[in-house]
Amino acid sequence: MESRIASAAFILVVATYIFLGGMGVTDRDNPAPRDAAYNLLARGLLSGHLYLDKAAPAALTGLKDPLDPEANRIAREDPRYRLHDLSYRKGRLYLYFGAAPAVLVFIPWHLLTGGWLPHWGAVVLLCAAGLAANVVLVRSVRSRIFPKSPGWVLGALVLLLGLGSYAPLLAARADMWEVPVAFNYFAVSMALWFFWKAVTQPEKAVRYIAFASCAFGAAFLSRPTVLVNAAILLLLLAPRGVRGRPSAWAAAVFPLAFCGAAAGLYNVLRFGGPFDFGESSQLAGVYVAHLHMFDGSYVWTNLRLYLVQGVDWSWVFPFAHEPAFWRLEGSLPVNHGGIEHVAGALVSAPILWAALAVPFFIRLRRPDRSFLLLSVAAGWVALSSLLLFAFFFGTSSRYQFEFVPGLALLASFGVLA
């Protein structure tokens, strides 16, 4: 019965992802998945080059400064070209995101099926895979730490992890920006599973440390913001039986370092420098190279927006709506880039407050060390991502998906506690 309830909940959540993804905003003005941004990158890679398999239009290449947002506005906003937020350098178009989703998702899909995976399909697939990893993790934690919890609770936790993680919001707007975020969700979920295996099976710790490092490395090749999360690898090296083993340190460092070097080489070949991910070459509505991308003056505003910003209630379905942000724009810090579809996570998903039960459970019941380490790891993943994006110049619901899944995982532990 327990497995049936959990399976039904999982199917319900994935069906929700599919419905929202298929009905949502994706690949605007682009009816053909073959021409979606990540498939353009996949086609380019299959052709032996790093730029998109798409020619830059003469309306762009003929400009004195193609990156000038006023000069490129006509070409950038022309629906025939779909240039917005692509990167441009030396007559070629690039994605400023990493190549991992193209290499590990879009190209294999094409080789196996002969078709081209739409962006929304990739986001749904990755969110479903990430959810599956988290469900397996929570089920293992439950059997080890909370064996007397009722059977139905796993089904409830599937709903918490699947709907309270903000994945539905990502699926509803599954375009090229959401693909690397969904990829990182899956990769970090796998890293946390390998983390748990490493702390519960110390005789196989080196193997699982290497797997966790590989997962973080793959995520870095998709979206470098994940690097702050990878600090949890240090927790795996802390136990006395592990920290003195050179093989454990090598397992933690080498896969991630190799992926970091690969990302640096990828950037050199595209933009001329290992740390240039292409943002300064973006075709955006602003001159991205001139922005104050990270600043301490944004922190408190962004934390308020991400965590406790209220919603507007109405009698119109779905009854809760994002606030009219024109009312808030006057209070934004200088150089702040604006607000995009944000409602406070702790307000819109109040079940996340259950995460507060975890430290009390640890203090009162003193479970084994593995649960303590996993809770710290999940907390660090959530906190480090939240703080990183608190310093960023703009707020967006897709950035919330960088830290809310970690809170949802902790909340599931809190419900069990």
PLM regions and their residue ranges:
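Membrane-proximal envelope and lipid/glycan-remodeling enzymes
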Residues: 1-417
